[in-house]
Amino acid sequence: MHGKYTTLKDIVLDLSPDPVGLHCNEQLDSSEEDEVDEQATQATQATFTQHYQIVTCCGQCDSNVRLVVDCTGSDIQHLHKLLLGSLNIVCPLCAPQT
């Protein structure tokens, strides 16, 4: 560059793109990585508890029932499966009737 201002004549674009192979010849055993990741996730979930608010329907009168539970992520998933299955929660008004 000569002078105070840049002109198009001063810019030289002589670079061309180089093709680069993106394939790698390294072999990884994915089953070992999955096991390590799964164990780390389970260990983290086992020690970390959290409050979960649950709103469901009474098994007798279909009114809304609110629950707050303190459990781990895997426990709340298990509770979710139970609520979708045969487990029914009953409201305080219907509880004496059962």
From Swiss-Prot:
InterPro entries: Papilloma_E7
Modification comment: Highly phosphorylated.
Motif stretch (Nuclear export signal): 76-84
Record protein name field: Protein E7
Gene symbol of the encoding locus: E7
Annotated GO biological process: DNA-templated transcription; symbiont-mediated perturbation of host cell cycle G1/S transition checkpoint; symbiont-mediated suppression of host innate immune response; symbiont-mediated suppression of host type I interferon-mediated signaling pathway
Main location class: host cell
Region (E7 terminal domain): 1-41
Function as written in the Swiss-Prot or TrEMBL entry: Plays a role in viral genome replication by driving entry of quiescent cells into the cell cycle. Stimulation of progression from G1 to S phase allows the virus to efficiently use the cellular DNA replicating machinery to achieve viral genome replication. E7 protein has both transforming and trans-activating activities. Induces the disassembly of the E2F1 transcription factor from RB1, with subsequent transcriptional activation of E2F1-regulated S-phase genes. Interferes with host histone deacetylation mediated by HDAC1 and HDAC2, leading to transcription activation.
Compartments where located: Host cytoplasm; Host nucleus
Organism (species): Pygmy chimpanzee papillomavirus type 1 (PCPV-1)
Subunit note: Homodimer. Homooligomer. Interacts with host RB1; this interaction induces dissociation of RB1-E2F1 complex thereby disrupting RB1 activity. Interacts with host EP300; this interaction represses EP300 transcriptional activity. Interacts with protein E2; this interaction inhibits E7 oncogenic activity. Interacts with host TMEM173/STING; this interaction impairs the ability of TMEM173/STING to sense cytosolic DNA and promote the production of type I interferon (IFN-alpha and IFN-beta).
Ranges spanned by the short sequence motif LXCXE motif, renumbered to the chain: 22-26
UniProt record similarity statement: Belongs to the papillomaviridae E7 protein family.
